[in-house]
Amino acid sequence: MTSAEIRQSFLDFFARQGHTIVPSSSLLPDSPGLLFTNAGMNQFVPIFLGDRAPDVSKWAGARPAKDTRAADTQKCIRAGGKHNDLEDVGFDTYHHTMFEMLGNWSFGDYFKKESITWGWELITKVWGIPAKRLFATVYSPDKSKNDPSDFDQEAYDIWAGVFKKEGLDPAVHIVHGNKKDNFWMMGDTGPCGPCSEIHFNLLPSDDEVEGRKLVNAGVPRCIEIWNHVFIQFNANADGTFSPLAAKHVDTGMGFERVAGIYATTKGFKDFSRDPSNYNADVFAPLFAKIEELSKKTYNGTVPTRREGLGEQENIDIAFRVLADHARCVSCAIADNILPGNEGRNYVIRRILRRGILYGKKLNLATGFFEQLVAPVVESLGAVFPELKERQDIIRRVIRSEEESFGRTLEKGLQLFNEGAKLLLDAHPIKGQADVPGVGTITNIGGVTRFLGGKFVFRLYDTYGFPVDMTQLLATERGLAVNMVEFASEMQQQQDRSRAAQKKEVIVAATEGDNTEAAQPTKFIGYDRLTADAQVLDVVKTDKDLFLVFDQTPFYAEMGGQTGDHGVVKIDGQTFAILATVKDKAGRFLHKLAPACAADVARLNPVGKKAALGVSPLARRAISRHHSAEHLVHWALRKTLGTHVRQAGTSKTKERMRFDFTHFEALTPEQIAEVERLVNSKILSNDKVEAYETEFDKKPEGTLAFFGEKYGKIVRVVDIGGYSRELCGGTHVSTTSEIGLFKIVAEMAIAAGTRRLEAVAGQAAYDFVEEHETALKAVTHKLNAGPQDVAQKLDSLLAHQKELEKKLKAYEQKAAAGLADELAAKATARDGLKFVTATVSIDNQDALRSLGSQVLHKLGEGVVTLGAALGDRASLVVYCSPAAIKAGHQAGKIVGELSTKIGGKGGGKPDFAMGGGKDPSKLADVLKQSAPGVICSW
């Protein structure tokens, strides 16, 4: 069987058992707290939790059968967070960042008997895996460690029957496992249950006793190929476990693992070779392309260490890294996870850059990585069609990243190699020795060389060289990185950055746990701008004063939206509220002017009634910008593609800023299209609705953002049914209230991240009016209508260019004449001619050109010219070969002269430049110091 046939036979087998075959879900998980989709069961979590009825037959792209049974092959990424296999990829033959998980599920339908017997039938009867080489694990709690529940007698009995039917001893083929290996939990609370794994003995011998010893021993010759999880309990908050009303089955099988074993063992028949997932033909197109590009051959060697590797070992590691990482990055980009600087996007950037680094080890030129996309599509495009559909954008994103990182990599590698060489060449002595600027050597039970954290941080901060790349390169050379020192340097940089921003940081004055226990403020400002409230607290910091109320119509700064300002009236006295922020206890802090402190103290407002009023003009302006931002997000995704994701926002009354993932600058046409789309929706007067729903019941296509903390109940902002986002901010009621929208700037803020700045409503009107006023002034100056301005400017610029050309010709002619005059005044000595002069000239380039012309006319000699250029003196010196041979050095002459006029200079023996801050001394210094005679021109 081919890999594709193994995958298809799995799906067809379960289709025959009444399972609905569903497509793989996106690698971009629906849960914002999850980095990537990392297991087949992720998309079924709402069903397991009871938040959604089983309805898989109605899912888009499904091959329908029963709603309570499902099977699929799921793309998964495990790199970063809890599951992180990145650093192992390439060094063995079974770790991957991206892999497929084959699985079947029962939602309150069949249970252990069907799951186990069907699984056994597939792998032994359909695929032909020898039964004698298989072992099953069952849950057996270790009560000394307070493992939950009881021994899984039901699973044991089913397995015992299976093995007896094969003529095998259950006592040998069934292995007991504790909570660590054989009890699955979704979290500290919630659905859970025992699991039963199937392990495959890959030793050359099929000795059952020897095979049993290797189960869960962490050796590649006996590995788990399929896990059956039986979800039958609920873990309660008090530590107890109660039975679920509906029992479920969740299974997962590593596709590459099974396909690799099949290929290695020639159809599960020859167990003489070490297993390797990379033997699966799903990797063949990639290996073929890498061999073509590198002119090297993959031999499948596997290292037993991380340093001192042989040439072929390094080649084979690089092949595996590139094959794996190309699959991972391509699939991620196809699912709109682009390389970036934060969260999951940064993980993809790390993986791509790690791949590029290993490409350098194969001497592959910049641009090679995007050529690996085609073989990924060849091997996976049939089962994951989004790879075919988005092949062009995948290549373009990778190309942009590769070109950007290529510049970083060259400089970073050079500096790393220099530092590593200094450290490795240093002589180890007893105790500790320092290698200045690089690191230390310690001799404690052996020699350890540490790259200093400051050195590593300089690579990272100045040259953008990722620290994990430095760690990888260091390990290969037997070095370690002082990560404690690196972390300290990073913290200091962050502290400096925060200080430089001079951003107001609000710290609640309440000490200890009181802030956490404080009563959260009730926000009632979505539909009203005024309210009566009770003062609960006065909060003071070193320089700020805040009031806390039981409820408020003031929106606190969050989600990129600036806080409201307005007024509060207490006992007839009115105070201006300058800003509103929220503390970690959920209290809204209403900032007053520091000058109010005495009045507030006399008033003693705690417990008193207050009348609150938000500035309606400011709130409307902020809301316009917030709703416009949602439209911008929609328009960008429509114009550029669904890979566009929000990466940061700011909404104030003056303007909005929207940061988003994209790999290249927007063209003027794209900017115009985004602006047109937004304004078209403003004109269509679409309804803007906000409503609350359960997170798992939000409408399909609703955008949520990684890193945000969403509760069970979320707020959806829906604009016309085409833009839906989870959002807690304030908005207009209809799009027409935005009025007008204008983009004012588009720029890059980081590799893979762009920024749009825009204005809406009155701010947009003011922007247009300002530009109209400027245009009217220009048309008046040009004596032309607005439609003729461009043509008139083109004509003026062409005329200017012609005049500049004539001026340059005149200046060259004048310079040639001046050069003749200077050369004619030269003095001769010892077979050389000398010209030393101060000249009146416009710029440095003209001075250099004049000096060169004079020397050319002299033949052999020394030319020293000075000029006052603005408030600085400038010098050039030229020496001919004969002059240099006679001991004259241009660099030395310039250095001495520059020092005397308050500056510095230097250069080569034949040409040098310099200058100083005091042009008034120039003529005297030249007269006293320079060879030859002084002229002034």
Swiss-Prot record:
Q: How is the cofactor bound?
A: Binds 1 zinc ion per subunit.
Entry's localization field: Cytoplasm
Query: Domain of life, per the record?
Result: Bacteria
Question: Is RNA-binding there in the keyword field?
Answer: yes
**Annotated residues for binding of Zn(2+):** 626, 630, 727, 731
Q: Any transmembrane segments, and where?
A: none
The prosthetic group or cofactor this protein requires is: Zn(2+)
- Cited PROSITE patterns: AA_TRNA_LIGASE_II_ALA
Q: Which reaction does it catalyse?
A: tRNA(Ala) + L-alanine + ATP = L-alanyl-tRNA(Ala) + AMP + diphosphate
Against InterPro entries, the record matches this protein to: aa-tRNA-synth_II/BPL/LPL, Ala-tRNA-lgiase_IIc, Ala-tRNA-ligase_IIc_anticod-bd, Ala-tRNA-synth_IIc_core, Ala-tRNA-synth_IIc_N, Ala-tRNA_ligase, Ala_tRNA_ligase_euk/bac, DHHA1_dom
Q: Name one GO biological process term.
A: alanyl-tRNA aminoacylation
Family to which the UniProt record says this protein belongs: Belongs to the class-II aminoacyl-tRNA synthetase family.
Q: What does this protein do?
A: Catalyzes the attachment of alanine to tRNA(Ala) in a two-step reaction: alanine is first activated by ATP to form Ala-AMP and then transferred to the acceptor end of tRNA(Ala). Also edits incorrectly charged Ser-tRNA(Ala) and Gly-tRNA(Ala) via its editing domain.
Concerning PANTHER family, the annotation shows: ALANINE--TRNA LIGASE, CYTOPLASMIC, ALANYL-TRNA SYNTHETASE
Q: What's the protein name?
A: Alanine--tRNA ligase
